[in-house]
């Protein structure tokens, strides 16, 4: 796919190169570089959403696992960071919903 280089930052273009290496060459170093580049930012975004350090760490790892599993589907219409943060956000929202459902079902069990 052709990329309009003027519409992306240098960092985004570097991400595209790392993604190509990860997907096409199965380059583990490329995966590691992407994770190193975004892990803290993803973690702190999730931490703001749930305010639990252990859960935030777990959800950060889950977000990267989902992103890397589907990296071959990534389209270069947007930056990798936008795509990754959307995955992390959706995964965290799912976690919050499941947690609320468990709390509600426990409350219902106790009142029955």
Which residue ranges define each predicted feature?
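Residue-level preference for hydrophobic side chains embedded in well-ordered alpha helices
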Residues: 34, 38, 42, 63, ...
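N-terminal module of bacterial RNA polymerase sigma factors
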Residues: 1-40
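Amphipathic, Lys/Arg- and hydrophobic-enriched alpha-helical face
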Residues: 35-53, 70
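A short, glycine- and basic residue-enriched loop/turn
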Residues: 28, 53, 57, 71-77, ...
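Sigma70-family region 2
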Residues: 24, 64-79, 98-100
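Arg/Lys-rich amphipathic alpha helix in sigma70-family domain 2
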Residues: 73-75, 86-106
């Amino acid at each position: 796919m052709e990329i309009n280089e003027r519409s992306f930052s240098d960092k985004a273009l570097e991400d595209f190169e790392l993604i190509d290496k990860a997907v096409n060459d199965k380059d583990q170093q490329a995966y590691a570089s992407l994770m190193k580049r975004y892990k803290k930012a993803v973690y702190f975004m999730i931490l703001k959403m749930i305010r639990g350090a252990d859960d935030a760490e777990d959800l950060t790892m889950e977000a990267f696992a989902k992103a890397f599993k589907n990296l071959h589907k990534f389209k270069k219409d947007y930056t990798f960071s936008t795509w990754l943060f959307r995955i992390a956000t959706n995964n965290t929202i799912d976690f919050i919903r499941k947690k609320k459902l468990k709390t509600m079902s426990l409350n219902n069990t106790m009142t029955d």
